[in-house]
Design a protein with these regions (language model features):
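Bacterial Sec-dependent N-terminal signal peptides
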Residues: 1-22
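Short, aromatic- and glycine-rich surface loops/edge beta-strands on solvent-exposed regions
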Residues: 178-181, 302-314
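Glycine-centered tight-turn motifs at strand-turn-strand junctions
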Residues: 175, 278-290
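Accessory beta-strand-rich segments of carbohydrate-active enzymes
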Residues: 25-27, 34-38, 67, 78, ...
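Beta-strand-rich binding/interaction modules
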Residues: 146-148, 237-276, 285
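Signal that preferentially marks extracellular ectodomain short beta-strand elements
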Residues: 165-170, 287-303
Length: 364
């Protein structure tokens, strides 16, 4: 990561009045769709053709009744700890096709593990000219590969963060394009184990699809790629670490401010400002946000939170991002946890992610 060359001038100032106007365009709704059982679509360049079925997104294939009928021969994701289901005479009626019920797995109406293709034609808004344009997939499962028209954009396979693709060089504002997404839910590089609650058919299920937000979004050419806040109670401040990305050298200024929420006590943190000069690519920026003498702390009894507002101004473009955080100190001493100096017992429940109707947790 390239180090930021900073002209440090941290001053207390008023909040900038200019706000970043990031745009978004929902791609929810009807998509063209096709199952690729033999995994031949990439070789045959299915991104160049029209797919032969349709599906509504966001959603999973089982939820939309796409895939194979469940039979006693279905290959499940998960260990079979009791195989008597397959030969016990008492269970015979539950092995009949069309009446299949399993005693230890959820039994969806449809099941599929493999590759499926999703395709949609869209026109990029003409007023997005000069902006960075991204495809945001909040929760695909598991691996995605994206094409715009015939250009491959890339592949991502994270199970814990959204898949985000930069389409700027592949699309033209005001003109139509075809977005094709190949989704593969086979267990490959991302192998959390066949009995992991996130994929096993005993609980959540190993589904193919895309859920949550599916959007085209814009950012300025200079933008916040990541913002992390580290509270420092002993010094009454928060350290804010930012990754600022740019397609070229740039300069400007960042303003940070914060206000309390999730509490009856109102506390506005005075803004601080810092100028920057960056290179193309990733640039690390660090700023300190003094919280004042009367800052609110977070714990289970008084869960006060803060909403950090970060404003980035670079020439004619600006961006605004918000991140929530709590002022709390968490330590381990011996066998005990301490939150803000108070000995704390942490309790929890075992949640197996059982969502038989959809295969995934609610995304709202």
């Amino acid at each position: 990561m390239k180090q930021l060359l900073v002209s440090i001038a941290i001053v207390f100032a008023s909040v900038l009045t200019a706000t970043g106007q990031n745009h978004s365009f929902s791609l929810s709704g009807k998509w063209d769709f096709q199952i690729d059982r033999e995994d031949i679509g990439t070789k045959e360049q299915w991104f160049k053709k029209s797919l032969d079925d349709q599906i509504n997104l966001p959603g999973s294939m089982p939820e939309k009744l796409k895939g194979d009928n469940v039979t006693a021969r279905t290959q499940w994701t998960g260990s079979l700890y009791d195989s008597s289901y397959y030969f016990n005479p008492y269970m015979e009626k539950y092995r009949i096709e069309g009446q299949v019920k399993l005693p230890f797995f959820l039994t969806p109406d449809k099941h599929y593990v493999g590759v499926a293709w999703y395709q949609k034609k869209v026109t990029i808004p003409s007023d997005w000219k000069g902006e960075r344009i991204i495809l945001f997939l909040e929760r695909p499962h598991i691996e995605t590969t994206v094409w715009v028209n015939t250009k491959e954009i890339g592949m991502q396979n994270s199970l814990c963060v959204p898949h985000v693709y930069d389409l700027t060089s592949a699309v033209t504002p005001g003109k139509p394009c075809r977005i094709t997404i190949r989704v593969d839910n086979r267990i490959k590089e991302i192998n959390v184990g066949p009995d992991s609650h996130s994929i096993t058919d005993q609980t959540q299920g190993n589904w193919n699809g895309i859920v949550g937000k599916i959007e085209l979004q814009t950012t300025p050419k200079v933008y916040f790629d990541d913002i992390q806040v580290y509270p420092d109670l002993s010094n009454g401040k928060a350290l804010v670490r930012m990754n600022v990305k740019s397609s070229s050298t740039a300069k400007g200024e960042i303003t940070l401010s914060a206000e309390s929420f999730n509490t009856d006590t109102r506390h506005n943190v005075p803004p601080v400002q810092q100028s920057f000069r960056i290179q193309a690519g990733d640039n690390r920026v660090e700023m300190e946000l003094p919280m004042g003498k009367d800052f609110l702390t977070w714990d289970e009894f008084n869960p006060a939170l803060y909403k950090l507002t970060a404003m980035l101004n670079s020439g004619k473009q600006s961006e605004k991002k918000q991140v929530q955080f709590g002022m709390r100190d968490f330590k381990i001493e011996g066998k005990w946890f301490y939150v803000n100096g108070r000995k704390t017992m942490l309790r929890g429940t075992v949640e197996n992610c059982d969502f038989p109707l959809t295969g995934y947790a609610p995304m709202d």
